[in-house]
Amino acid sequence: MRLSDFHYELPPELIAQRPLAERSASRLLCLDRDTGALADRRFRDLPDLLNPGDLLVFNDTRVIPARLLGVKRDTGGRVEVLVERVLDEHRVLAHVRASKSPGEGVVLWLEEALEAVVEGREGDLFCLWFAGDLPVIELLERHGHMPLPPYIERPDAAEDRDRYQTVFASRPGAVAAPTAGLHFDADIMARMRARGVETAAVTLHVGAGTFQPVRVEDVSRHVMHAEWTEVSTQVCDQVAACRARGGRVVAVGTTAVRSLESAAADGELKPFSGDTRLFITPGYTFRVVDALVTNFHLPESTLLMLVSAFAGYEPVMQAYRHAVAERYRFFSYGDAMFIGPQEASDKMQETSGRGERPRFDHEI
């Protein structure tokens, strides 16, 4: 397929710049994976769309305050650092923005408190060593800014420390939030438990590469960025138990999808820990995931391609056109979708006005 196939027109005012007052107050566009039917709901309705015995799989990564501002110590030239990956207690791989790229040995003075030395480069990333006795994770927690996406056109604020983080975040390492999880609050979690829905957690540390545009028109030539993920033995056992009782595996976010599908790359779900470059486009055969909770994604993005692979290209693009027409809020702080098979959608009222089942382009 072509990159331009995944373009859609989005009025800028639909890009959410701040979170709603309540996490679960977001809207929820439901797309029936079997029929293409659409329904406009609220996110707090999600427990009613799940069945007892279903397994919800979250990404438990925690966003680190990975953005640092400062200067080159010797010249005073401004720099902006975005940590991509923490290597050990003192070293990181980072994107460094400056008028002139800093060379090996250059000292950066960041947030008027931190000293970092450029040790070298790995491709587009810089290897930085942070001085001091404290681990770099703690330094970032004290001095860093939350790495809001580039389409949020405001400085980070105190509320972002809480709201650009899921309520179940526990393993620091991401530089972007797994945004489908941002809608869940304590009430939603309690209602799902009461309904008999089980939960599991994988980890995928979302990298800044998630915001990088696809630069080739033939999407099959795109090289996916690497992100670290882990799927435990416990999660594999939970998925097997879910299958045995006839439940559905519901991934919360595209990162949970990529974690699970990476761990099942040879056809069987197995424990996995390491980097994944899994790039899912229409034509991909899903091995683990039956339903998906996801936000609305950027035009021409790899995430939109993944969702199109899961639910069919035409139904997804129709759903996006509907979302624009109905003034849904888009991207990280925006609204969500629930994409499930027909048995998850018995309460849906079709809004698309189509009586004919659409063709799903799984063989593109």
From Swiss-Prot:
Residues 344-364 are annotated as: Disordered. GO terms for cellular component: cytoplasm. Pathway: tRNA modification; tRNA-queuosine biosynthesis. Its main location: cytoplasm. It catalyses: 7-aminomethyl-7-carbaguanosine(34) in tRNA + S-adenosyl-L-methionine = epoxyqueuosine(34) in tRNA + adenine + L-methionine + 2 H(+). Keywords: Cytoplasm, Queuosine biosynthesis, S-adenosyl-L-methionine, Transferase. It is an enzyme of class 2 (transferase). Pfam families: Queuosine_synth (PF02547). One of its GO terms (molecular function) is S-adenosylmethionine:tRNA ribosyltransferase-isomerase activity. InterPro entries: QueA, QueA_dom1, QueA_dom2, QueA_sf. It comes from the Bacteria. Its EC number is 2.4.99.17. GO terms for biological process: queuosine biosynthetic process; tRNA wobble guanine modification. It is found in: Cytoplasm. SUPFAM superfamilies: QueA-like. Monomer. Transfers and isomerizes the ribose moiety from AdoMet to the 7-aminomethyl group of 7-deazaguanine (preQ1-tRNA) to give epoxyqueuosine (oQ-tRNA). Belongs to the QueA family. HAMAP family: QueA. This is S-adenosylmethionine:tRNA ribosyltransferase-isomerase. It comes from Thioalkalivibrio sulfidiphilus (strain HL-EbGR7).
